[in-house]
């Protein structure tokens, strides 16, 4: 079992937040594309080192890597969510199968861009045998909710609710010069 936390160096975290703060529209993605590409490569290399550290320190067979990347812009109303992180490069660096681009595919199919949360919530509720119906609140950077009504009928729904920890993180970065999340 691996119980380890892999933190971005402060300088790298600042670069991510600085670039994210500049990108407020779809057009900004093009304006800052050179910076995005450089940061994406740096992030992917960091994640490849994390994957290799995990592989080295476990005796478990790893079938594939799920790679979310780092959200830099998100606007489901315009059917776009941009994460930096190159799944193909991560696959090359780790020599493993990498599954990626979760959010954009979900948005293109009418979702909010968080396709894994409801699937995980449904499996968790079923495994620990929670009585239905149930509502699960996930407070991450953006809060989302999963409502599960019935397993047999596959009756469940999920959606974003609004800001979660991102507001606290932004306040701490601005006022305390540190990181919350």
Description of each model-found segment:
Residues 1-18, 99-127, 135-181:
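Glycine-rich phosphate-binding loop plus the immediately following alpha-helix
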Residues 2-42:
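Conserved non-catalytic scaffold segment of RNase H-like nuclease domains
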Residues 26-87:
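Short beta-strand-loop/turn "lid" adjacent to the catalytic site in phosphate-handling enzymes
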Residues 49, 53, 89-92, 123, ...:
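Residue-level signal for well-ordered alpha-helical scaffold segments within enzymatic catalytic domains
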Residues 58, 127-128:
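Glycine-rich helix-loop-beta junction characteristic of Rossmann-like nucleotide cofactor-binding loops
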Residues 60-62, 131-134:
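A general structural motif
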Residues 61-119:
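Glycine-rich phosphate-binding loop and adjoining helix at the ATP-binding site
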């Amino acid at each position: 079992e691996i119980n380890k936390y892999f933190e971005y160096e402060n300088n790298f975290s600042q670069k991510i937040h600085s670039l994210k703060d500049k990108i407020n529209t779809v057009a900004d993605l093009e304006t800052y594309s050179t910076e995005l590409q450089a940061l994406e490569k740096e992030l992917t290399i960091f994640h490849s080192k994390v994957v290799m550290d995990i592989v080295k320190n476990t005796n478990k067979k790893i079938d594939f890597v799920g790679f979310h990347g780092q959200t830099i812009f998100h606007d489901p109303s315009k059917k776009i969510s941009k994460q930096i992180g190159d799944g193909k490069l991560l696959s090359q660096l780790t020599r493993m199968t990498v599954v990626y681009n979760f959010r954009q595919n979900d948005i293109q199919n009418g979702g909010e861009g968080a396709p894994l949360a409801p699937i995980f919530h449904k499996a968790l509720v079923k495994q620990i045998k929670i009585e239905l119906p149930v509502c699960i609140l996930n407070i991450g950077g953006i809060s989302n909710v999963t409502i599960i009504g019935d397993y047999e009928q596959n009756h469940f729904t999920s959606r974003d609710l609004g800001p979660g920890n991102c507001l606290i993180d932004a306040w701490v970065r601005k006022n305390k010069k540190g990181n919350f999340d």
